[in-house]
């Protein structure tokens, strides 16, 4: 381990295997707090590289509680959080809408990072249990078409890093690992990142991790597809990364200001998302969710973004997405 420390302290990049070895030791509690702090800051100052991020993700996945992975195609739609936008929870709403569009979703989520209501906070408000077994989650995925995997339930080793992360009070590699360590290991994903500088390295990381097809996005300060600014996209397809930009017009939608997506208290966010999923929400909310679902559908093989957007909007207005919420809550 000292050889790995020395490489980091000399601003050298770790191999994927070295990073995997290092993070396996971290989540097993083998590093002291000063050692862990030094490691995280050394990587942050140099800039974490794709093979290091991939190695860390592989260590966390190897040590996660197992999930019975299905043999059919399924997706994740998730963001890093931490964008500071305090928006409504678009990725969680999009997961329900995508599911109602017949796309299987195994969504990995956690408590809030920067908004007042993360995906798990919102699910709890809907009466959806967070601590169900992997077998029950798989059953929900099979029968309803959607399940949620609560990160702390699967990644118990995170607790060893938490005291240092709280003391450092700065972003580290742990802030970008969440979307990469879904224990269901989905072959397809739409991943939002909190900074445009992360789009390329996370896309390269997804290639290393073996995703079949995925898109990494950032838009005007938000970790998702947004309609107030161009969305920067790096799409993984057939082992290649394709870069492009999307605007509201590409989805057949009008632009909305970022302020139109502003969230509130957990109670407010729950009410706004409830109305949205029942087809009675604000137009800006419905359009934002439809755009994200449309891109996820493209990743799923449905290439026409405008057609996808209209299908998503019709699903939202029908209230079918809310039926998925009720079905999951009933199982809880």
Swiss-Prot record:
It catalyses: N-(5-phospho-beta-D-ribosyl)anthranilate + diphosphate = 5-phospho-alpha-D-ribose 1-diphosphate + anthranilate. Binds 2 magnesium ions per monomer. Mg(2+) 2 binds at residues 223-224. Gene3D superfamilies: Nucleoside phosphorylase/phosphoribosyltransferase catalytic domain, Transferase, Pyrimidine Nucleoside Phosphorylase, Chain C. Pathway: Amino-acid biosynthesis; L-tryptophan biosynthesis; L-tryptophan from chorismate: step 2/5. GO terms for biological process: L-tryptophan biosynthetic process. Its cofactor is Mg(2+). Keywords: Amino-acid biosynthesis, Aromatic amino acid biosynthesis, Glycosyltransferase, Magnesium, Metal-binding, Transferase, Tryptophan biosynthesis. Anthranilate 2 binds at residue 165. GO terms for cellular component: cytosol. Its EC number is 2.4.2.18. One of its GO terms (molecular function) is magnesium ion binding. Pfam families: Glycos_trans_3N, Glycos_transf_3. Anthranilate 1 binds at residues 79, 110. Mg(2+) 1 binds at residues 91, 224. It comes from the Bacteria. 5-phospho-alpha-D-ribose 1-diphosphate binds at residues 79, 82-83, 87, 89-92, 107-115, 119. Signal peptide: none annotated. NCBIfam families: trpD. Catalyzes the transfer of the phosphoribosyl group of 5-phosphorylribose-1-pyrophosphate (PRPP) to anthranilate to yield N-(5'-phosphoribosyl)-anthranilate (PRA). Homodimer. Belongs to the anthranilate phosphoribosyltransferase family. This is Anthranilate phosphoribosyltransferase. The lineage of its organism: Bacteria, Pseudomonadati, Pseudomonadota, Gammaproteobacteria, Enterobacterales.
């Amino acid at each position: 381990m000292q050889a790995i420390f020395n490489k980091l302290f000399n601003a050298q990049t770790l191999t994927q295997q070295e990073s995997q070895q290092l993070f396996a030791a971290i989540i097993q509690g083998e590093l002291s707090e000063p050692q862990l702090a030094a490691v995280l800051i050394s990587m942050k100052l140099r800039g974490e590289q794709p093979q290091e991020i991939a190695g860390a993700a592989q260590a966390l996945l190897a040590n996660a509680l197992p999930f019975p992975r299905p043999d059919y195609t399924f997706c994740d739609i998730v963001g890093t959080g931490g964008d500071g936008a305090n928006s409504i929870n678009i990725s969680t709403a999009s997961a329900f809408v995508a599911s109602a569009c017949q796309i299987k979703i195994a969504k990995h989520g956690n408590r809030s990072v920067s908004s007042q209501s993360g995906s798990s906070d919102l699910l709890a408000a809907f009466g959806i249990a967070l601590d169900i077994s992997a077998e029950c989650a798989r059953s929900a995925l099979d029968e309803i078409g959607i399940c949620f995997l609560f990160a702390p339930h699967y990644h118990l080793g995170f607790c060893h890093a938490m005291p240092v992360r709280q003391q450092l009070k700065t972003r580290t590699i742990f802030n970008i690992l969440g979307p990469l360590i879904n224990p269901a290991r989905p072959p397809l994903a739409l991943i939002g990142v909190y900074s445009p500088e992360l789009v390329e390295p996370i896309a390269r990381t997804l290639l290393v991790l073996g995703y079949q097809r995925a898109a990494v996005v950032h838009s005007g300060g938000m970790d998702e597809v947004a309609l107030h600014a161009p969305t920067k996209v790096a799409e993984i397809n057939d082992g290649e990364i394709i870069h492009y930009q999307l605007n509201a017009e590409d989805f057949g939608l009008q632009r909305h200001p970022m302020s139109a997506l502003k969230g509130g208290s957990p109670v407010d966010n729950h009410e706004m998302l409830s109305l949205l999923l029942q087809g009675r929400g604000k137009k800006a909310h419905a359009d934002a969710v439809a755009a994200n679902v449309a891109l996820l559908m493209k990743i799923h093989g449905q290439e026409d973004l405008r057609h996808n957007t209209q299908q998503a909007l019709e699903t939202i207005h029908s209230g079918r997405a809310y039926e998925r919420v009720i079905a999951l809550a009933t199982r809880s």
